[in-house]
Design a protein with these regions (language model features):
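N-terminal Rossmann NAD(P)H-binding glycine-rich loop of SDR-like oxidoreductase domains
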Residues: 3-22
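Conserved Rossmann-fold NAD(P)-dependent oxidoreductase catalytic core, especially the SDR/UDP-sugar
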Residues: 78-113, 123-132
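Conserved cofactor-binding/catalytic machinery of classical short-chain dehydrogenase/reductase
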Residues: 76-80, 116-117, 176-179
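NAD(P)H-binding glycine-rich loop region in Rossmannoid oxidoreductase-like domains
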Residues: 37-79, 99-105
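A conserved pocket-lining segment of Rossmann-fold NAD(P)-dependent short-chain dehydrogenase/reductase
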Residues: 153-175
Length: 181
């Protein structure tokens, strides 16, 4: 079985890669190497996925600003799904999203782009996993990494007598990476 991991170098993707590479053949795809959508080599890039039985999309621009960032978050998953359908390829497509898409008050670019991606993936053969805050533990201790490092840095500010949480606030119900796989 061949499993393709998109975003294999990120916090979640690298963990999934480490766990699954012990049992399966892994195809690693880096979207930073992806040609522009209108580039003649874009189809060749998509063909890299053709031999995959399972595709796990962990790629995301957490602070999307550029046209490319938004393409990665909201358009690429649907583009890939349509490509694989066109190739008449049987595969399982797992798209990682965020639990924040369910919070209507969340208006940050990342959440909006993930919400759009989910809408575009409706009526496709895609499994969407909405993940909460992910944490990594080592020897029973929470490690600074992923989005948790933002919270650690925030709480490490020494000059504030209190720590305001900006509206709409965040609901932190962390899940350890070990519980994902």
């Amino acid at each position: 079985m061949k499993i393709c991991i998109i975003g294999y170098s990120g916090f979640l993707g690298s963990y999934i890669l480490k766990k699954l590479s012990k049992k399966f053949f892994i195809i690693k795809i880096n979207l930073r190497e992806m040609p522009e959508f209108d580039d003649k080599n874009f189809k060749n890039f998509l063909n890299k996925f053709n031999k995959s039985n399972i595709i796990i999309n962990c790629a995301a621009a957490l602070k999307p600003r550029s046209k490319r960032d938004f393409f990665i978050n909201q358009d690429f998953p649907k583009t890939l799904s349509l490509h694989m359908k066109k190739m008449k390829k049987k595969f399982l497509f797992i798209h990682m999203s965020t639990i924040n898409v369910l919070i209507k008050d969340r208006k940050d670019p990342y959440t909006i782009s993930k919400r759009i991606a989910e809408k575009k993936l409706l009526n496709t053969n895609t499994t969407i996993l909405r993940l909460p805050l992910l944490i990594k533990k080592k020897n029973g201790y929470i490690q600074k990494g992923g989005n948790l490092s933002i919270l650690f840095n925030y709480l490490n500010l020494n000059f504030l007598p209190f720590y305001p949480m900006i509206f709409p606030g965040h609901t932190f119900k962390p899940v350890t990476l070990d519980n994902i796989i």
